[in-house]
Amino acid sequence: MKSPHKVIYCYLIILYKLSSCHIYYKYIPFRLTVLVNYFLLLNVGEIMWKKLESLTSKIYEKARKRKGEHRIALLIDGPNMLRKEFNIDLDKIREVLSEFGDIVIGRVYLNQYASDKLIEAVINQGFEPKISAGDVDVEMAVDATELVFNPNIDTIAYVTRDADFLPAIRKAKERGKKVIVIGAEPGFSTALQNIADYVIKIGEEFQLDREKLEKKKKNKFLKVEEKQKDKEETENREEP
């Protein structure tokens, strides 16, 4: 789609050319008026275009929310979860989360001792490896907090058993984000499970078929959305 200021530009160029003809040449104010109008209309056209883009974006956002689609940021605590005893399949995690929405960010946090083979496997499965020389939890928590303020993300999924992420999760929920936690026993923090909107335990939900997972998702995860919707409707009724 052509932006309106381009159409205005073409129209005014024609007027300007006409003003160059001998029949209008003596009317210098006419030419000046064309130039002034060009710059004025160009700015107006730019403003109108931006407003149209903003309106279109809002309409799309509302339609997306009605359908229950989520834009998910997936953060995986590598040292805590990518262990032989858990035998985690990153593709399976992606498949399970696809039931909730689209994964727009997928990161695997690793320490400096991660093998080249593991890093290569993470990349080959379409995830972004983030290698830290320090505490992996700190870097992951910092990124998680930044995502709380990202308007393009409405759901944050953690793959971890660690309660260190509770502050970041609380902040996310305060800002209206949904939180999914994927973990495994032993050592899966009870506090982490209680604060999440939806919990997936590796070894349980990962063995469920698609129909059962969909049923569990609707029964628990989407109830949070219904409560949020009721809250918004109540606030709208209270407005004068």
Curated annotation (Swiss-Prot):
CDD domains: PIN_LabA-like. It holds the Pfam family NYN. InterPro entries: CHP00288 (IPR002790), NYN (IPR021139). One of its GO terms (molecular function) is RNA nuclease activity. This is Uncharacterized protein MJ0482. It comes from Methanocaldococcus jannaschii (strain ATCC 43067 / DSM 2661 / JAL-1 / JCM 10045 / NBRC 100440).
